[in-house]
Amino acid sequence: MEELTPRRIVEELDKYIVGQKNAKKAVAIALRNRYRRKKLPEDFKDEVMPKNILMIGPTGVGKTEIARRLARLVKAPFVKVEATKFTEVGYVGRDVEGMVRDLVETSIRMVKQEKMAMVEDRAQKMAEEKIIELLAPYPVQQTAARNPLELLFGAARQAEQTDKNQEQRIKRIDFEREMLREKLARGELENEYLEIEVEDSKPPMLEIFTASGGMEEMGVNLQDMLGGLFPKKKHKRRVTVREARKILTQQEAQKLIDMDEVTAAAIKRAEEDGIIFLDEIDKIAGREGYGPDVSRGGVQRDILPIVEGSTVMTKYGPVKTDHILFIAAGAFHISKPSDLIPELQGRFPIRVELESLTCEDFQQILTEPRNALIKQYTELLATEGVKVKFTENSLVEIAKIAYTVNEQTENIGARRLHTILEKLLEDISFEAPELTGKEIVIDREIVLEKLGELAKNKDLSRYIL
């Protein structure tokens, strides 16, 4: 984290998101402040609260992507929730505490994967030993005596003979296992089939009442509650050695990690580094106390204690929300940030306005980011042996059309490019298997031929683009 200076964070975000310098700067500072807080003395650390961010801007300009890439950059637990999914207590809908529970689940998954990666080599060796056991099992010890008379006559001689046979068999199997071990190391058995026992991954679920009175599926499973009284259900599967190695490595890795340690580390990570992205905050900005939107103000009041810092009960234990970073976002076309209740406004001190995308922005989005759309489409078609090239003037035209359609109809930001490229490459994608080995050049004329009329006709572009 030390090398992630605000400037470096912005540079990393620039690899995936075009423009929006102010928003990138705000999140970079918020992230760096977390690192600074961790270096403070213990007695002062708890006094420093994160400065939550409110992003204001139309859809498709990069609000969610900025938050998501930021979380990936620092390996922080991240959840995106829509504020419209929540309702105040007493109405049908999700309880606002659900977002904290989701964050803890994400954190548990992250820490568990990290711990499993640390023991992967050991787990793989154990899995390979299991595969060898399944391919060359030791014989089952059989009782020498078959009827009561044998217990009196000749039982000792027979037992001696049986033991010798057993020893020879075991030696033969040991030799066979060594051969299998060598073949397994050389990858010669990858496509051989064998039968393995697989544990059921889905435990029985219970719905329980939460502290706020709502019904929330917390994933409490009977096994945790009854302390392993019931053994885990298993079923047999016939798989290749390659698949068996993956399944058994996973099972062995889970046995090697300490889940109590995972839970403690995950809760700490969620509390200290967690990021909750509250989308569509503008949709609950009204303060009406009647009609279909009666619970809007109630949702804001319910969100308030979580944002300002409270303790939420989860199935893994209590989680403090004091130092979780909240990033709220909304288009605010109809409502204004000032329509939020004053207490909630005060909890989002950093306001960032994201600009609508220009024609130049669209051009950059097509080619510059690491996951640029043009790269995505050309790589997809390359898997069929079709080489697609876009000329510079074709990219300019695509950007112009995207900008024009956004201006004439609803502004959906960069998502408009997906619609336009799908329409443009529709025939090529359909015929790709028959075009193997060919090179297709897409220039301005082809773009205008496919999309020109649609873009000019307002009614058509409203439905098709």
From Swiss-Prot:
GO terms for cellular component: HslUV protease complex. InterPro entries: AAA+_ATPase, ATP-dep_Clp_protease_ClpX, ATPase_AAA_core, Clp_ATPase_C, HslU, P-loop_NTPase. It holds the Pfam family AAA. Transmembrane segments: none annotated. One of its GO terms (biological process) is proteolysis involved in protein catabolic process. A double ring-shaped homohexamer of HslV is capped on each side by a ring-shaped HslU homohexamer. The assembly of the HslU/HslV complex is dependent on binding of ATP. Belongs to the ClpX chaperone family. HslU subfamily. One of its GO terms (molecular function) is proteasome-activating activity. The keyword Plastid does not apply. The keyword Chaperone applies. PANTHER family: ATP-DEPENDENT CLP PROTEASE ATP-BINDING SUBUNIT CLPX-LIKE, MITOCHONDRIAL-RELATED (PTHR48102), ATP-DEPENDENT PROTEASE ATPASE SUBUNIT HSLU (PTHR48102:SF3). ATP binds at residues 18, 60-65, 279, 343, 415. This is ATP-dependent protease ATPase subunit HslU. Keywords: ATP-binding, Chaperone, Cytoplasm, Nucleotide-binding. It is found in: Cytoplasm. ATPase subunit of a proteasome-like degradation complex; this subunit has chaperone activity. The binding of ATP and its subsequent hydrolysis by HslU are essential for unfolding of protein substrates subsequently hydrolyzed by HslV. HslU recognizes the N-terminal part of its protein substrates and unfolds these before they are guided to HslV for hydrolysis.
